[in-house]
Amino acid sequence: MNLDAHAKTLDNHGYKESRMNACGYSLGSTFSPTWMDVPPMIFTGNPLIIKPGMVFFTHMILMDSKNQLAMNLGETYLITENGNERLGKQKLDLVVL
């Protein structure tokens, strides 16, 4: 697993101070002490090998600690023999209010 591309993209657009050091986690049964333990989190240096049948929620969190605001966008994917399958059914069209 690799967070570098995610981090580099956000850093290059001025969000280095706002991003987290992980960008998703596995879904399914995990055991104590918590679901936040390694290897479920997606971060640089994680030794987990992604295999068909695994499900991941990949997300981007941007935080503004000064104003106590946060934003999160994410998608759930099933890993398949040929890549991945997006499990969300919502449209990906840009909505401008």
For the regions a protein language model found, what residue spans apply to each?
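Active-site cores enriched in adjacent His and Asp/Glu residues with nearby glycine-rich loops
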Residues: 1-33, 49
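Charged, cofactor-coupling segments
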Residues: 22, 29-97
